[in-house]
Amino acid sequence: MLEIAVTVTARIPFQSNQIDCWRSFQSRSNAASSLRNLRSSSLATWLVAVACLGAPLGAYCQTADHSPTNPPTQNANPALSAAAVRPSAAAQQVPRLTTTVEVHGEAKDDYLPDAVAVGTLNGSTLKETPLSATVITRDLLNDQVSRLLSDVVKNDASVDDDYVPVGYYGWYEIRGFAIDMATGLEINGMTIAGEQDVPLENKERVEILKGIAGLESGVANAGGLINYVTKRPAAIKAIDLATDHRGSTYGAADVGWLLGSRKQVGARFNLGGERIASYMNDTNGWRALGAGAADWKLSPMAILKGDFEYQHKVERDGSGYQLLGGATVPDINQIYPSTMLGDQPWGPPDTYNTFNTSMRLDYTLPHNWAIFGAASYSHSLIEDNVIYAYGTPFDANGNVSCPNAPDAPAYFFCPDGSYGIYDYRDPGELRKDEVAEAILTGHVKTGPVIHDVAAGGEVFLRSVQQPGFYTMDNPYSSDGIVQDGAVYAYVGSENIYQPTAPVAIESPLQSAGPRRLWEDSHQAAAILQDRIHLPGRIQLIGGGRYDALRDHNYSGWATSPCTASPVPGPVGDPCPTTYPAPNQPNYSVVTPPNNTDQDVWLPFYAATYAPVSSVTLYGNYSELLSLGPQAAWWVDNANQFLAPYHTRQAEIGAKYEPSQRILLTTAFFRTRAPFFYPESDGAGGFEFVSQGRETHDGIEANVQGKAANWLRLTASAAAINATSDETGTPAFDGKQVINVPHLHTTVFADLTVPHVQGLHLMPGWSYSGRKEATRDDTVSVPSVNIFNLGARYTPGGEEGRVTFRIYANNIADKKYWSDTGTNTGDSFLWLGAPTTVRLSAHYTF
């Protein structure tokens, strides 16, 4: 089956300063006939228009009005990061600065942003930064009719799905390491609660930043992070309409204004709604969103920016498959992506209410100094409900009930395809991320050496609240209805090779316990960096982040405040030393919170060399601190979090930009982290441990931009050898890590059709190598090729106001396994999406 996506894109209206620039150019043409001749030249007109859309134009536009986003006394793009860049030729301009990697740039018609990494002190291009990054522009998002992050990350071969259910927010991995949902997603460089589907309607681009150092991200997982950049105010009025072959409907509006005598105030609003018709049975839903952005140039030296977005989403989500008996991949020819495992008519949908907001003030100081301050708040409230397909069925006595396999592991499906069905309800999951930061930057020259220095601080607060125990004295209610956390009730069994059958919900109907504090995390960081510019196009960067981490995880205590088995570690209040309930004498020892109180220095060192203007060679070394993972429920140290761990990475790379239209990059990296797995005790039990290491050695190559006048291209390839060693289990040593293919490639092209004005064809292809499903590499899913095809048509040519798009994913309707990742210690298999065809139309007034 096919789904079609069509998007329409119109000419972007000029802002006032751009109109003034154009008029200035016109007024400087001495003869009207000369101007008419110039206008007849499409190339010359295009060059002038592009110039007027960009930064101040020197001879033509230095006196023109500036938009509130780009005051004339500061650079168009901010700065602070370990990613150092060449200094400004004229050292008078004082850059702004941020402590997280973010890429800023203006959209062009070549899929190549004029971008900088935040942390670079002067608004430099991607070519000049000592790190690897991919930027998905607004044009590319439109051409692929993207709605979710899963639509976006397919453009970078270094990114893979890790655990991406239909109807639920997804987990992803970069360079083979899973993103930490607490710290791995950002909006405008500010960390957000990652447990959400971030709307794309108000985003100008999405940045995938790889190999991030602790300087930018503080305490996070290795691999990288994903940053969303919001649209800024502009004079625009546009609408989008879309559908697909399954009956989804979509509408959105994008309106903005520039106000004031010099356009010093701007506002922009995005509104949207969607009725979601999913390819998986009974997982349909809907969503509504509203977003706004405002810029205010308070003075020639100061600008204030603000953003907010809110999304309400309701949708049922489905479960993934598991290995049969822990040793066999299900027969893909007998199962279908449309099947919702364990589907029951009484299953409620998930409900999401997410809110993200931020504010930033930039101020230019005298004598080549600048300062900025920013604050953000992110809120994700989820009613998490799913008919959960997991593990084996059980008999009335609680024993594994697999036909002809009584000893099958309970945490995998039965060898014959039977599985257990659970009523899982976890209402009121509340996650909040709060960030505040301030950075001072300056420019110092000592003889032939130039220093771009930055210093500042950041505070990060995160809290997680979920259902917990009924009372301190009674984890459950006396009638057994109120649980000590989420509802997780076994209700029956099904078989993956048979149609689903109705089963009754548990009786009496259970309810989740009251909301309790599960996690309270604080980070206070001091940031310092010096970027040294030496003669001969050489730069040296040294810096780091001193991070004071105070992370207190109460998840074990919140669901069972006291247990019969002591757990090593500090005993934390509010649970008393001795359980006070006389009617439960077996509960006498505290389950302590998992406390992490650690101060750490996270360095970043880099060097760049530009032998010629079109080439940049770089190398970097960085360290990162990550919080330990959580053990699965079925190991001896069930649900416990392991200690924090360090990750170290070294990277060298080269970037080549033969023109301003295309960028070619390659990078070689080595990342080393501890290896975590459930270790057998030899007596049928397991303990989740950190033993040995996993080393990810990889090569990345990317091409992004306009390869020819008729061809725009986004292509990526990643070859990663991710192996585990010294694990204590010989069968795991020297083996490829689960869910990391040796080779992954992706290509998307935009081909201009000759002789048909405004028509483009957009073919795409991706290849993913074999993925291992077990740690000893004895079970894997095969490699797969996926082909996509789309078209874009703008009646009247590229300057038309309306654009139609059609885009089809997986046009061959290939049935395949998309990932073999893990979630809280358990392994899952997910089927890839079938053919999906979307149609969209965009109109600009």
Segments from the language model and where they lie:
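Gram-negative outer-membrane beta-barrel transporters
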Residues: 536-540, 670-672, 689-774, 842-844
